[in-house]
């Protein structure tokens, strides 16, 4: 591992220790609370939509959220470790078989829906077991 990769890994570990980032995948509906500066004031705005992609790794990791606002599709790319993100909440888990859901851009109405992933008791316990090991 070269020096730059080592520095990026250390920085990502440091930032992840400070901030709690939930585990989510493309297809999940997420609410991202973003800090917005307007002049000398700062407020928090919620942006809720479907995560259609995750890209990068470490410090450079980002995700794309798509929502429909007044009949128009709006997409926004957020860096996971951005200081402008106050929190990320997973509202719904979706069942998809793709890592990138760009095909949703061409879909309208019911065909753009994503089925909800059913959480069983075994799948809820599984992540806890992985973190202990």
Swiss-Prot record:
The keyword Transmembrane helix does not apply. SUPFAM superfamilies: Translation proteins SH3-like domain. GO terms for cellular component: cytosolic large ribosomal subunit. GO terms for biological process: translation. Belongs to the bacterial ribosomal protein bL19 family. This protein is located at the 30S-50S ribosomal subunit interface and may play a role in the structure and function of the aminoacyl-tRNA binding site. This is Large ribosomal subunit protein bL19. The gene is rplS.
